[in-house]
């Protein structure tokens, strides 16, 4: 409710809501619909990865437009054990198919639990796309990491156990 009030108090949001919905009413549902539409508008189909993938038959084949180091990183992404990055970022656009708890330290954010009211969903969030990730920090649902090195360090040594931690990370 506080977000609804805050947005309604800003003149240009009322104008934008009127353009989008026919009147200036700001509601949770309209905010949700607007955000969902915005996220769907972010399309990346000409990344260096997309271009390389179009040149080969399989994800694990070396991409001709990648350096040796980039191809090595791609193999690690798909095959590193015990858990590869692609275990969670598992679609063609590297978005996860389910919300997950990725073991962030000191995370008090309810995540999906705020919607489902189930304690099994505490700390679970949508797995974001990794397309063009290097050009769009900050990282994690709360923006706590500013570099990809920090993200890698988290997954290497920083995962905090909790009852709802994703099984791929246990």
Residue positions per predicted region:
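Extracytoplasmic redox metalloprotein regions
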Residues: 1-57, 62-66
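Short glycine/threonine-rich turn/loop motifs
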Residues: 47-166
């Amino acid at each position: 409710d506080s977000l609804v009030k805050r947005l309604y108090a800003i003149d240009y949001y009322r104008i934008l809501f009127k353009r989008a919905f026919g009147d200036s009413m700001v509601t949770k549902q309209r905010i949700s619909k607007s955000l969902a539409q915005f996220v769907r508008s972010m399309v990346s189909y000409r990344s260096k990865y997309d271009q390389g993938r179009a040149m080969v038959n399989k994800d694990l084949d070396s991409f001709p437009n990648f350096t040796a180091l980039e191809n090595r990183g791609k193999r690690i992404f798909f095959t590193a054990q015990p858990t590869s990055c692609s275990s969670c970022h598992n679609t063609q656009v590297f978005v996860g198919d389910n919300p997950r708890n990725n073991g962030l330290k000191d995370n008090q954010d309810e995540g999906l639990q705020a919607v489902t009211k189930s304690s099994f969903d505490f700390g679970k969030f949508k797995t974001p796309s990794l397309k063009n990730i290097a050009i769009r920090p900050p990282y994690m649902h709360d923006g706590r990491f500013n570099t990809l090195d920090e993200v890698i360090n988290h997954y290497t040594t920083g995962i905090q156990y909790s009852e709802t931690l994703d099984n791929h990370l246990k």
